[in-house]
Design a protein with these regions (language model features):
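A short SAM/SAH-binding and catalytic strip from SAM-dependent methyltransferases
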Residues: 143-156
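Class I SAM-dependent methyltransferase SAM/SAH-binding core
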Residues: 86-133
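Conserved class I S-adenosyl-L-methionine
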Residues: 2-74, 77-85, 170-197
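A short glycine-rich, Lys/Arg-flanked "PGG" loop and its adjoining helix->strand segment in the class I
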Residues: 157-172
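Short alpha-helix
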Residues: 198-213
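Conserved Class I S-adenosyl-L-methionine
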Residues: 215-297
Length: 297
């Protein structure tokens, strides 16, 4: 398949861009003979990592994604967080948030967010499900945030369209410059002899937005690293599961992590911690008569 040039801009053929995005994401499928050899799902979501990260960014909000959403909430307004996790995107916005709706596929993640929001005096409306399937249920908001979800969306055009339609003021997307699991590629080669994909990328998403006629701004920056894991053993276990390796290979995984430069005293997630990320924002096209609703604070 001919690969479209992500830098081609609005003239790039949207159909080709969308097909390339789908094909690249499909390339991340793990061969059945590898997944069949283990009992645990490799698509693990380390909930404690999400919780620690949400707590850290809530304590000291910073970065372009926060700044764009914060500015759009002047005057205060409602927030819809798509793929909320434990709340790293929306919790820092609570001081200017009049109503919070949170969408996630994982009930455990919604519970983590609700616990933290309610501790701050906000009762969120929780919408379990996949975006954009639950877009109608989630409704509209002044600001829509969506952090580190786009690489899960094979059908990216309706995903982006629904974000735009849901926002009265602004959509703010945050994503890593390249697929977050790229950092595991050397380990897949080491343990399975498997060459993993390198795409898609944030540049490709920007090209898709342009081809859709959406004028988006973007800013690249490095997200500060932090102590995402409580211990090196926890990082080792999550990495082992992600690599479809049995428990008796934990020592081998630990050795590989150390060989890669991971400091056991400061275990960080191999996904997006300390990595270059891109904040992307564009105007929503939700109805101008959107009511921000009664405060749920």
């Amino acid at each position: 398949m001919t690969q479209p040039d992500p830098a081609a801009g609005p003239e790039a053929d949207l159909t080709d861009l969308l097909e390339h995005w789908r094909a690249e994401l499909a390339g991340w499928a793990i061969p059945e003979q590898i997944t069949a050899a283990v009992d645990e799902s490799p698509w693990v979501l380390p909930r404690t990592v999400f919780a620690r990260r949400a707590d850290r960014v809530s304590a000291a909000p910073s970065g372009p994604s926060f700044e764009r959403a914060w500015a759009a909430l002047d005057p205060p307004g409602s927030v819809l967080d798509v793929g909320c996790g434990a709340g790293a995107a929306c919790l820092p916005l609570l001081p200017r948030c009049t109503a919070l709706t949170a969408v996630d596929t994982e009930a455990d993640m919604l519970a983590l967010l609700a616990e933290r929001a309610e501790a701050s005096g906000t009762r969120p409306r929780l919408v379990p499900g996949t975006w954009p399937d639950v877009a109608a249920t989630a409704g509209m908001a002044d600001v829509v945030t969506c952090h580190h979800v786009t690489y899960n969306a094979a059908r990216i055009e309706p995903f982006l369209t629904a974000l735009t339609d849901a926002a009265s003021r602004l959509v703010v997307v945050e994503m890593t410059s390249s697929h977050p699991l790229v950092s595991l590629n050397p380990f897949w080669l080491r343990f399975h002899g498997l060459v993993r994909p390198s795409g898609p990328t944030a540049d490709e998403l920007l090209a898709i937005l342009a081809a859709m006629g959406i004028s988006a701004g973007h800013q690249r920056w490095n997200r500060p690293g932090g102590r995402d894991y409580g211990s090196f053993a926890e990082l080792t276990n999550v990495t082992r599961i992600r690599l479809c390796l049995p428990p008796d290979r934990a020592d081998d995984v630990a050795a590989a992590l150390i060989d890669s430069g991971i400091d056991p005293a400061h275990p960080v997630d191999l996904g997006s911690s300390g990595r270059e990320v891109v904040t992307i924002w564009w105007d929503g096209r939700g109805g101008n008569d959107l009511a921000t609703g009664a405060s749920n604070r």
